[in-house]
Regions:
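A structural "domain/chain start" motif
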Residues: 1-42, 47, 134-140
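A residue-level signal for beta-strand positions that form part of recognition/binding surfaces
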Residues: 8, 51-53, 98
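Second-shell loop/turn segments in exported
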Residues: 15-22, 111-119
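Surface-exposed short loop/turn segments
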Residues: 39-45, 53-96, 104-118, 126
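Compositionally biased, intrinsically disordered linkers/stalks adjacent to structured regions
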Residues: 117-140
Length: 140
């Protein structure tokens, strides 16, 4: 839960350090986390010197084949995104953490990845943001 003394938050740009770069991923993840904090808390956005600060980086963005068939082709592929997040709470530093969050989604290997990439990224980002938010502000 959020301490009553915490009034402001900031989400620093989450940079992309993955080998495979998806151009909008950093911006989308940063903005989704900011939006979730604005919509689901009474906290106010503050560009710097906020009571709580999220920062981090995308460290992995990759596709790997899943469920290999008899003809040795994959029926499914898995897109995985891993992010390292640092959470700093200037009011209660016992809440501070550095954690890796990871989510994936599977898709049919017959689908054109380029055509579904944005949709898959949206699904994974929503799950990552939920986990980051819960870990920082719901304390589960």
């Amino acid at each position: 839960s959020i301490s009553e003394n915490v009034n402001t938050f900031c989400v620093y740009y989450i940079k992309n350090n993955a080998q495979l770069i998806q151009p909008n991923l950093s911006n989308n993840l940063t903005e989704e986390l900011k939006t979730k904090c604005l919509n689901e808390t009474n906290l106010t956005w503050q560009e710097k010197d906020a009571d709580i600060i999220f920062s981090g980086s995308i460290n992995d963005y990759y596709i790997k084949p899943m469920s290999i068939q008899n003809n040795e082709t994959a029926a499914q592929n898995r897109l995985t995104i891993k992010v390292n997040i640092t959470y700093k709470n200037s009011i209660d530093d016992s809440q501070n953490f550095k954690k890796t969050f990871s989510h994936y989604t599977d898709f049919d290997s017959s689908q054109n990845f380029v055509e579904i990439e944005d949709e898959l990224n949206s699904i994974i980002i929503a799950n990552l943001v939920e986990d980051i938010f819960n870990s920082a502000l719901v304390n589960w």
